[in-house]
């Protein structure tokens, strides 16, 4: 094909499923497809148009047989990428009709399946389970045995009547036991040495 041929003939020749690219070499030894020099930027537009046409026809036939599926966050990202891509196409000599058509398709996809966000965010996995957090509480420290923590010490201290009623008899009894044990051991030792 040459540049003098009409663009309609160029598009008609590309409607087949295979396109042959003949590689030639430019002056510096690297190979460049001849079609790049022929179309000079029109190749991208032709390929995009062919992609959109084949996408529409294949999507119509494939949607008849397949059940509808819910939209995922990735689908939304793809839709927004298509939207930004279509903005770039509009600036690159894209017709206003195609731009508006693509824009409407993207908006309809987003409106039709916008409930997935609500469904996804209200899943039971995202609500923290209260019972599980109760199981992992840090155990309380057991209080150490101390005179300071007793109810007697908290009420009146060392000189309170309740404390003295308990402390003085126990002190006297422990001293009497210690003295009695000391006397018993002392006598045993003295009698055992005299028998030898």
Swiss-Prot record:
Organism: Bos taurus (Bovine)
GO CC list: endoplasmic reticulum; mitochondrial outer membrane; mitochondrion; nuclear envelope; nucleus
The entry's keywords: Apoptosis, Membrane, Mitochondrion, Mitochondrion outer membrane, Phosphoprotein, Transmembrane, Transmembrane helix
Low complexity composition-biased segments: 56-69
A GO molecular-function descriptor: identical protein binding
UniProt region (Disordered), positions on chain: 47-101
Modification Phosphoserine occurs at: 54, 66, 86, 92, 95
Motif (BH3): 100-125
Protein name listed in UniProt: BCL2/adenovirus E1B 19 kDa protein-interacting protein 3
Membrane topology annotation: Single-pass membrane protein
Main location (coarse class): mitochondrion
Family per record: Belongs to the NIP3 family.
Organismal lineage: Eukaryota, Metazoa, Chordata, Craniata, Vertebrata
């Amino acid at each position: 094909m040459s540049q003098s041929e009409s663009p309609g003939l160029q598009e008609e020749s590309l409607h087949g499923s295979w396109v042959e690219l003949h590689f030639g070499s430019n002056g510096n030894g690297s190979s460049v497809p001849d079609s790049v020099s022929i179309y000079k930027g029109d190749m991208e537009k032709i390929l995009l148009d062919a992609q959109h046409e084949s996408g529409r026809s294949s999507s119509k036939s494939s949607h008849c047989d397949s059940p509808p599926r819910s939209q995922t966050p990735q689908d939304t990202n793809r839709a927004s990428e298509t939207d930004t891509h279509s903005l770039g196409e509009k600036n690159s000599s894209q017709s206003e009709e195609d731009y508006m058509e693509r824009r409407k398709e993207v908006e309809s996809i987003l409106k039709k399946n916008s409930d997935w966000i609500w469904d996804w965010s209200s899943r039971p996995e995202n609500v923290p389970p209260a019972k599980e957090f109760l199981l992992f509480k840090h155990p309380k420290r057991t209080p150490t045995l101390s005179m300071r923590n007793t109810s007697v010490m908290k009420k009146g201290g060392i000189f309170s009547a309740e404390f003295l009623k308990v402390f003085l008899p126990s002190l006297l009894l422990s001293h009497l036991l210690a003295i009695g044990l000391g006397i018993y051991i002392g006598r045993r030792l003295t009698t055992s040495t005299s028998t030898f």
